[in-house]
């Protein structure tokens, strides 16, 4: 019997999703940024997906950004948020047990002049609340 314990990173697709994705890959394999027919077909699938996600999340379609994966998403979220708030907030708080994509991005932000606070965690990986309080109100 197989036990897959990394569902946070990737999870098996349902058969229904597999069929939809395979159909899209078969029918609309063009570059969605291109102006040719296959590109426009692919862009239709991308826009339709963005609309459905936006509706589900009750946000604007323009707020949906597709990335290649978790690392790119973490970089975009962390760097974008940090740089947008640089004048009002220069301290970032994290832990040493984050995913490498977060730790590497925090190191990059430290090199850009941000103060990075690494909170300690207990044996179960839970943040020590006293350390968090101190980091929030030095």
Show where each model-derived region lies.
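Pyridoxal 5′-phosphate
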Residues: 1-138
């Amino acid at each position: 019997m197989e036990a897959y314990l990394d569902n946070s990173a990737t999870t098996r697709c349902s058969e229904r999703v597999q069929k939809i994705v395979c159909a899209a890959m078969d029918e609309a394999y063009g570059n969605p940024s291109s102006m040719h027919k296959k590109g426009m077909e692919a862009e239709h699938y991308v826009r339709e997906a963005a609309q459905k996600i936006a509706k589900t999340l009750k946000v604007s379609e323009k707020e949906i950004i597709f990335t290649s994966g978790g690392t790119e998403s973490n970089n975009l979220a962390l760097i974008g948020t940090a740089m947008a708030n640089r004048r009002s907030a220069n301290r970032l708080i994290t832990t040493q047990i984050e995913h490498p994509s977060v730790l590497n991005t925090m190191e990059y932000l430290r090199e850009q002049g941000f103060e990075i606070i690494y909170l300690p965690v207990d044996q179960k990986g839970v943040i020590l609340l006293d350390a968090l309080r101190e980091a929030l109100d030095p």
